[in-house]
Regions:
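N-terminal, Lys/Arg- and Ser/Thr-rich interaction peptides
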Residues: 1-55
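Positively charged, aromatic-enriched nucleic acid-contacting surfaces
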Residues: 58-170
Length: 171
């Protein structure tokens, strides 16, 4: 195989039968790949230099951009000393008018009684209400993980060092 560059098709060429939808999709992708409002970005109090968007901002963006969305909990369970949640974020694609989805996962450690160390296999040292506290937090992490797939606006690149800038096709 020789070292010739193969020209990739443009979005317009891929969607030649419906160029208006292709243009709208590019515009949506351009919007979703803008940097988030820096006033919204927070630094995690316990994880060194870890940036994140609070869930209220993520939910605001879902409502504002997609108009219709819903969260489906696919799975909850135990993962070592934590609870885990898998969610599916359903959203109305504003370009196609179809419902689509992204999946996400999240986990949160169970709080244990002071001085007892890690969670014991019989779970005798978990605090009362530990699951009640941890499960919604894990769900929040899962929703935010699913929404990362939308792009930078939802915080996908906040903790990445090497990123590629999105540039919409001109034609």
């Amino acid at each position: 195989m020789d070292n010739q560059l193969i020209a990739l098709p443009t979005v317009a060429e891929l969607f030649s039968d419906n160029i208006q939808d292709a243009y709208k999709s590019e515009q949506l992708n351009h919007l979703l790949n803008q940097e988030p409002n820096q006033n919204w970005v927070k630094v995690h109090p316990f994880i060194n230099n870890h940036k994140y968007l609070p869930i209220d901002k993520v939910e605001f963006l879902l409502r504002k951009i997609f108009k219709q969305y819903r969260i489906e909990v696919l799975h909850t369970g135990m993962l070592l000393n934590a609870v885990q949640v898998t969610v599916r974020v359903h959203y109305l694609n504003p370009v196609t008018g179809t419902m689509e989805f992204h999946d996400g996962v999240g986990a949160c450690e169970l709080q244990t009684k002071q001085g007892t160390g890690n969670l014991q296999m019989d779970m005798s040292n978990i605090n009362k209400g530990a699951v009640t506290m941890a499960l919604p937090i894990a769900k929040t992490f899962a929703v935010k993980d699913a929404c990362d797939h939308f792009g930078k606006l939802f915080g996908s690149d906040l903790n990445r060092k090497d990123t590629v800038s999105f540039t919409p096709d001109e034609k």
